[in-house]
Amino acid sequence: MVSTDAHSVVIDPFLTGNPKAAAKPEDLKVDAVIVTHGHGDHLGDAIEIANRNNCPIIGVYELVTYCQRKGAKQGHPLHIGGSYNFPFGRVKLVPAWHGSAFVEEDSSIVYTGNPAGVLLFMDGKTVYHAGDTGLFGDMKLIGDRHSIDLAFLPIGGNFTMDIDDAVEATKLLRPKIVVPMHYGTFPVIEADPAEFAQKVQAAVPEVTVKILQPGESVSL
């Protein structure tokens, strides 16, 4: 969750069924719910949280349409490269290399558009949430065009970048602070964030690594 004194936004709220979750859907008070792609561990509790807070789900068009068909009362569709100024700040979607589909209870698969990363501009700060993604060269373009205060990068491997690729991503993006994510939730994505921190320090010492435990925060 990204918060200022006046506003809060949550990204990919996978709480129910998440063994690492430190909050419940009813605990969150937010102005918007941003979803990077349609996999169940990212769509998570988005619809419930958005409806409880009478706020929109923000994401690519197909995903927002799917959420509205599933009961979301408000949605704001964007697409890759698109941005919009909301009362809490500006949201811009950027590419991510991954998949995006929701597996229904009957095992049918529903296409939910392209996966995305998110640039979030709030209170004079820029936050980049990569979503689930592999390493790609245009991360340099994202870093060149935006002075990123805080970046969230996956390190778990298997479905996303591993530690070494995430270090390369950090070199391309050059954020002030980077937080590793998408690791340790399941055995197949076990990774050591301390190893990531050591390798970032060696490769780009001007970048600060913050390793957060569930419920912890970092201030900008």
For every predicted segment, state its role.
Residues 17-18, 39-44, 64-67, 82-85, ...:
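Active-site environment of divalent metal-dependent phosphoester hydrolases
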Residues 3-9, 83-92, 121-127, 220:
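Beta-strand-turn-beta hairpins that frame and shape the catalytic cleft
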Residues 68-83, 167, 171-220:
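Binuclear metal-ion centers of metallo-dependent hydrolases, dominated by the metallo-beta-lactamase
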Residues 1-39, 44-51, 62, 100-111, ...:
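Pre-active-site segment of Zn-dependent metallo-hydrolases
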Residues 47-103:
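Glycine/small-residue-rich loop that forms an oxyanion/phosphate-binding "nest" at active or ligand-binding sites
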Residues 10-13, 30-38, 58-61, 128-133, ...:
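Active-site neighborhood of phospho(di)ester-bond hydrolases with catalytic His/Asp-centered motifs
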Residues 103-172:
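Active-site-proximal loop/helix segments of hydrolase catalytic cores
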Residues 30, 54-55, 148, 175:
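Local beta-strand N-terminus motif with an aromatic residue
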